Amino acid sequence: MNLNRRVMGSTGTSSDDPPRGLSFSAVPGDQLHTPGAKLVPWIRAAIVASLLVMLFGAFVRASLSGDGCGTSWPFCNGGSLLPDTSVLKSVIEFTHRATSGLLLLFLAGLYVASRRVFPARHDVRAGLLLAVVACIVSALIGMILVRFGWVVLDRSVGRAITMPIHLVNNLVLLAGLVWAQHRAAGGAVSKWKGQGPLGQAFTMSVISVFLLCMTGALSAMGKTAFSVEKAMTNSLTERIQMHIGEGAHWILRGGALHPLLATSFGIMLVLCVNLMMTRRPEAGVKKWGQYTIGIFLVQMAFGLVNLIASAPWFMQLGHLLLALLNWMALIMTGVYALRVTASDSAVVEPVEADVAPAPRPVYAGIISDYIALTKPRVISLLLFTTLLAMFIAQQGMPPLGLILAVMVGGYMAAGAANTFNMVVERDLDVAMERTC
């Protein structure tokens, strides 16, 4: 593709066409004339089907049906082709396996169809192939969970490691489908590398969502593995004590990080998305950026209600659905924010200078910028007063590990707060037209 001309879609659709409605496509449905236009509704159907299969998988876990087929896989209870219909959890587990298999066949069929329409190395083919591979990996993870008995009330380390990986893999599957649908509909080409602050903001957003979803998966596992103990609690205070009190299981302690990290990572996500909307104030970026922030705020409120209500299965599914929708909105925000424009490929003539400035080393620049943002002199004063209070409370020297944790963690927290404050103040200045 010649990037020195205006970037066009698959049939010449301008990448500057604004998105409309709630569709993931770059142009309205009645204007789709790309070679892959016939694939677009099928890819959208695959997105919906994937969401349903993922939600049903969460229902399998929440309903304690993961052992419905015993340790047999892919068949049920020792090789039976069909489950015992008199046992509800066997029907639930087998239905999830069957629908997952049908989804894999559907995705594989879409990939084969895309090979007939799009040339090699096209984004649609790459996105669908990524979805197929992720679906296969998801099936293998399911096999591991069943074969090792890491289901229902199991509290093993293996399950605690596998469940977060399972959810992140599902996010990758959805990302591949969303990207393939966008490009099949004539959406603009996007480039992650070499995008400066835009690429860095999108990278930080993706990492934040990954980490948040991983702790969320651990929290959901704890709700299942300790469902008997949770049912014996009578109040929110008892449930909180069960998670963070003395003698609390490490899985529950890890799950308790989820609502705490949701706040910090949520701030990071909002700031990064806002940066993308500010740096590239175009219709597509604003639309999907607003969706990303809006869905996340709804998800936060929903999660709080979920916590107070002791996380019934239907609210767990609702919380997961919001997380998946938020992820897809973030992907679309990045797609539009990182799109390749004509100016990106413009040839810049070199300007001769008498003395070329010496380039500043990359790491030296990062360290210098970090110090400027975090204001270490101010933080040092705060840490000194904190450390003094620790010595007074201990009536002597506190444990070395505690000192290191407070000093390092305090510096990072205060530095991040300073950075956020400067970014917010800058955005306020721009909004109030006090600066250029």
Where in the sequence are the language-model features?
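Membrane-interfacial catalytic/cofactor-binding modules of polytopic membrane enzymes
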Residues: M214-F265, V270, N274-M277
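Interfacial helix-loop-helix junctions of multi-pass membrane proteins
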Residues: V60-T71, L140-P164, S219-K230, A301-L324
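Acidic (Asp/Glu-rich) catalytic motifs at the cytosolic membrane interface
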Residues: F56, V60, H96, A414-C436
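Membrane-embedded alpha-helical segments that form the functional core of polytopic membrane enzymes
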Residues: A45-V48, K287-W288, G294, F384-T386, ...
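N-terminal signal-anchor transmembrane alpha helix
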Residues: K38-S65, S208-S219
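Individual transmembrane alpha-helix segments
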Residues: D84-F106, A248-T263
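Hydrophobic cores of alpha-helical transmembrane segments in multi-pass inner/ER membrane proteins
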Residues: L102-G109, V168-A184, S264-L271, L324-R339
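Extracytosolic (periplasmic/ER-lumenal) interhelical loops and adjacent juxtamembrane/interface segments
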Residues: A62-F94, A225-I251
